Amino acid sequence: MAIGLVGRKCGMTHIFTDAGAAVPVTVIHVEPNRVVQVKTLESDGYRAIQVTTGSKKRSRLTKADAGHYSKAGVEAGRGLWEFRLEDSDQDYTVGTELGVGVFAEGQFVDARARSIGKGFAGVVKRHNFRTQDATHGNSLSHRAPGSIGQNQTPGRVFKGKRMAGHMGDKNITVPNLRIVGIDAERSLLLVKGAVPGTKGADVIVRPAAKK
């Protein structure tokens, strides 16, 4: 099964194993994921489902989104996400609700979310450069990156050069996190380790691609 779920990060806590060891976990609240659209090989060239979760006032929707939800007959959510289907996956119908039962305890998953933005950061913070001398003639270049290139040849700065810039606030996938607990009553996933994003951030949880 390749489909995943969209949940919200609640924060981190820890649980204890039978041996008494503390395990750090991220708690993800998964509201029902409602299928808004089913894509097929015949009409779209590939198989996938489009889901939404949560709720959103109709007055906050664009006309295009309002029409899309109305056509499907599904309550508007806070966003739209798509999951590709494999040939072995079952067929889904519009309006189907998916929950934490999609996953099993002990299963490995990939978690994708938008990382916390850190603003404009220098190379020491952003790329872990070491600082230059604090003294011995160094007056202005304590946290400077140093040389960023050569001379007239090649006469440019190469792409990918690590420099100061905006840090964080980008989509990050953390692979191979193990589900150590599922609370079906409260629709919670307990995932071992840290997941990107702030509290309340949308997290896409998929079966691990490399397990």
UniProtKB/Swiss-Prot annotation:
Domain of life assignment: Bacteria
The keyword Lipid biosynthesis appears for this protein: no
Statement: the UniProt record of this protein carries the keyword Aminoacyl-tRNA synthetase: no
Disordered: region residues: 134-155
Family to which this protein belongs: Belongs to the universal ribosomal protein uL3 family.
HAMAP family referenced in this protein's UniProt entry, alphabetically: Ribosomal_uL3_B
Protein's name in the database: Large ribosomal subunit protein uL3
Protein source organism: Methylococcus capsulatus (strain ATCC 33009 / NCIMB 11132 / Bath)
Gene label: rplC
